[in-house]
Each structure stands twice: as C-alpha cells, then as structure tokens.
C-alpha cells in the first residue's frame, strides 16, 4: 500500500462523488422544472451521461497518478457516494421539492390504471403511497450499476501493464 491510506481514498471519493452527483442533480432539476419538454429532457440526459463518464474517468486518472494505485476501489467508493446523494435528491425532489412532479406521476398512473384489472389497481394505488422510497432505491441501484460499469471499462482501458515487473520474472523462473 502506498503512503496514502483509506482515509485519503474516502475523503477524495466523498469530494469527487459530490461533484459527480452535482451534475446529475442539476440535469434532473432542469428536467423537473421543464417537465413537458422532450428536447430539454433529452439534452439534459445527454449532458448528464457524457459529463458523468468524463468526470469519473478523469477522477480515476487523477487518483492513479497521485497514489500510484489501481483506481478501481476509489472509483467504487466515488460511485457509491455519488449514487447515495443522487438517490436522496430524487426522493426529496419527488416528496417535497417538486410536489407537482408527484401529481404528474399520479396522473399518469391513474390513466394506466383504467386498463388494469381491479387487483392490479389496488397494488398500484398502494405503491404510489411509497413512491419516494421506490424512487430512492431504484435511482441508487441504477446509478451505482451504471457507475460500476463505467469504472470497470475505464479501469481496463487505462491500466498499463509493465512488462519489466518482478511478477513476470517470477512466473518465468517457475516455468523453467
């Protein structure tokens, strides 16, 4: 392990995770403010996705350059914290910050309920009472899995193998 400990990794991951979450929060807020605009929603989605990928890869490269360690564990910490912040924001936005959003969701659900059988309608109505919690967990899982995939791809594409390291020599000695 290098001179940097777990405390350094987690403190850096917290700061970088907040910056990463800020992009998602800003883009989601824009879509909440302009709910009917498909173009605004699409642009916000594209900006959020591209900026998040670019930032995570940049943070991983910075961490690897600073510590000399494999940045995958740092990226997982960053993605975990960022996903938690985004999930809390989405739940708060639905429950308190944008109450009209919950009304729109409820209206869409009511329209789709008319096509459901009676037992399905009862389940959906009970589910709507817990929608902020459902949004929290679904956002957390979605963001964490997306971040995990991006981190894994970035880690495998940026990893440099040193052909002159001691491990390779030990393997050759064992084969001889």
Predicted regions and their residues:
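Low-complexity, intrinsically disordered extramembrane tails and loops of integral membrane proteins
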Residues: 1-7, 159-176
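Transmembrane alpha-helical insertion/packing segments
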Residues: 1-62
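Alpha-helical transmembrane segments of multi-pass membrane proteins
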Residues: 11-19, 73-86
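Alpha-helical transmembrane segments of multipass membrane proteins
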Residues: 23-31, 48-52, 82-90, 146, ...
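Membrane-helix interface/capping segments
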Residues: 59-73
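Functional transmembrane-helix hotspots
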Residues: 88-115
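Short membrane-interface loop/juxtamembrane segments of multi-pass integral membrane proteins
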Residues: 111-131
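Transmembrane alpha-helical segments in integral membrane proteins
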Residues: 132-163
């Amino acid at each position: 392990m290098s001179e940097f400990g777990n405390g350094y990794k987690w403190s850096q991951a917290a700061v970088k995770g907040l910056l990463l979450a800020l992009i998602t929060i800003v883009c989601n807020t824009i879509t909440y403010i302009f709910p009917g605009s498909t173009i605004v929603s699409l642009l916000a989605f594209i900006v959020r996705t591209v900026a998040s990928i670019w930032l995570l890869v940049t943070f991983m490269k910075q961490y690897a350059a600073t510590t000399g360690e494999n940045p995958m564990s740092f990226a997982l910490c960053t993605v975990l914290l960022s996903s938690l912040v985004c999930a809390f924001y989405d739940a708060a936005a639905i429950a308190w910050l944008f109450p009209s959003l919950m009304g729109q969701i409820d209206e869409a659900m009511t329209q789709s309920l008319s096509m459901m059988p009676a037992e399905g309608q009862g389940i959906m109505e009970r589910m709507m009472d817990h929608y902020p919690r459902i949004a929290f967990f679904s956002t957390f899982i979605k963001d964490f899995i997306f971040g995990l995939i991006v981190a894994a791809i970035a880690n495998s594409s940026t990893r440099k193998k040193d052909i002159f390291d001691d491990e390779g020599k030990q393997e050759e000695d064992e084969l001889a």
